[in-house]
A protein has these predicted regions:
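Acidic, surface-exposed loops and disordered segments
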Residues: 1-247
Length: 247
């Protein structure tokens, strides 16, 4: 009996190890479109720290976005000063890693930061991490100290979520889009992807207009409209592919 129990324990341990490996492989093999469908806002995170490998991968993604879009985004790890005490007490938990969305002030900066933040959030999702885009409720003074002379529009909390989050309430495609003539499949796919994008207060106050292969996106002019447009553009591109051009 002792041998059978030992063998059973070994087999159980092996099965557990295989499941862990399988989960890791699934996360690493997730493509951006899958990440887009699975990503939801998470406001409570576990105490599990980011590994050195995860930090390296996230910083590589930050560097690529900074170089491509002339930004000054940075990743802060193990820093709990980004949120005010009241928010941490009642609304959020475990926010200690975050991207600072920053750059030199210029026309189009907010949109570029929104676009880059979408890339960072979905990349983090492919690594098995969760995110939360925070615009108006972070401790601006504490965060801005890390990037003197730069404009900061928000932060993106990143880490291991206590839950995977839930899908936000969404408008219908007809409420946020219009197309001149019969709607091509690529446009419909792009709009559906855009509806998965996180926007300020989840209001989805954007409009996508298409004619031929030209597409434009407008917003209602709120404080975060520039960032929202960038985030929505990223998602639309992911859904529509290369069948169109921005007007």
């Amino acid at each position: 009996m002792g041998t059978d129990i030992a063998t059973g324990n070994v087999m159980e341990a092996a099965d557990t190890a295989m499941n862990v490996v399988a989960d890791a492989v699934t996360a690493s093999a997730m493509d951006p479109k899958q990440a887009m469908r699975q990503r939801h806002t998470v406001r409570k995170f576990t105490s599990e720290p980011l590994s050195a490998e995860l930090i390296l991968q996230l910083n590589d993604c930050v560097r690529a976005n900074n170089e491509r879009l002339r930004l000054a985004i940075s990743l802060k790890v193990g820093d709990e000063s980004a949120l005010p005490g009241a928010l941490k007490l009642f609304f959020a938990k475990g926010v200690r890693n975050y991207f600072v969305l920053a750059g030199s002030d210029r026309p189009g900066l907010d949109e570029d930061l929104g676009y880059a933040s979408a890339d960072l959030m979905l990349f983090a999702q492919t690594l098995g991490l969760n995110t939360w885009w925070i615009g108006g409720t972070f401790s601006r003074k504490n965060v801005e100290q890390a990037v003197p002379g730069k404009k900061v529009i928000g932060i993106v909390a990143v880490g291991f979520g206590a839950t995977p989050g839930v899908a936000h309430k969404s408008k219908a495609a007809s409420e946020v889009s219009s197309y001149e003539g019969p709607v091509p499949q690529w446009f419909a796919n792009g709009v559906q992807a855009a509806l998965l994008a996180p926007t300020a207060l989840n209001k989805q106050c954007f409009q996508v207009a298409g004619a031929g292969n030209k597409v434009s996106i407008t917003e209602n002019g709120g404080v975060f409209s520039g960032a929202d447009i960038g985030i929505v553009k990223y998602h639309f591109e992911l859904g529509a592919g290369d069948a169109f051009e921005w007007a």
